[in-house]
């Protein structure tokens, strides 16, 4: 029975050690181990924008004019909205004709329906030119 009495004081020592380990855990958060985690960076989500292309067109039309980031964001949103409208209209046309695919014809018709007057005519001519250039190369 005497050995059991000796075990009780031994059990108190690990509890004292656990109390000592708590400050170590606190040190880990701001310590150097956080620096080691910098090696593993999260992969950035690729967000597709039209900013580069908007800028290229701006420089073709007005080489001396710049654009603010807020204006660029508005232009990017505008292009996304127009493309969504065109895609939705092209999808409707494909469904009406009971076709499973959206072809250049559906896109051309949706451009004529979504865009007004002269803008539609210019868009159709530029689109036709782009498709012809793509198929010839």
From Swiss-Prot:
CDD domains associated with the record: HFD_H2B (cd22910)
Annotated region (Disordered), positions in chain: 1-45
Entry superkingdom: Eukaryota
Modification after translation, per record: Can be acetylated to form H2BK6ac and H2BK33ac. Monoubiquitinated to form H2BK143ub1; may give a specific tag for epigenetic transcriptional activation.
Any one GO MF annotation of this record: structural constituent of chromatin
The keyword Lyase belongs to this UniProt entry's keyword annotation: no
GO cellular component: nucleosome; nucleus
Keyword Ubl conjugation assigned: yes
UniProt entry keywords in alphabetical sequence: Acetylation, Chromosome, DNA-binding, Isopeptide bond, Nucleosome core, Nucleus, Ubl conjugation
UniProt-listed InterPro entries: Histone-fold (IPR009072), Histone_H2A/H2B/H3 (IPR007125), Histone_H2B (IPR000558), HISTONE_H2B_site (IPR055333)
Modified positions (N6-acetyllysine) in chain numbering: 7, 27
Compartment(s) where it occurs, according to its Swiss-Prot or TrEMBL record: Nucleus; Chromosome
Record cross-link Glycyl lysine isopeptide (Lys-Gly) (interchain with G-Cter in ubiquitin), residues: 133
Pfam families attached to this UniProt entry: Histone (PF00125)
Compositionally biased spans, kind Basic and acidic residues: 1-37
Record family assignment: Belongs to the histone H2B family.
Entry function: Core component of nucleosome. Nucleosomes wrap and compact DNA into chromatin, limiting DNA accessibility to the cellular machineries which require DNA as a template. Histones thereby play a central role in transcription regulation, DNA repair, DNA replication and chromosomal stability. DNA accessibility is regulated via a complex set of post-translational modifications of histones, also called histone code, and nucleosome remodeling.
Subunit structure: The nucleosome is a histone octamer containing two molecules each of H2A, H2B, H3 and H4 assembled in one H3-H4 heterotetramer and two H2A-H2B heterodimers. The octamer wraps approximately 147 bp of DNA.
Protein name: Histone H2B.4
Species this chain originates from: Zea mays
Organismal lineage: Eukaryota, Viridiplantae, Streptophyta, Embryophyta, Tracheophyta
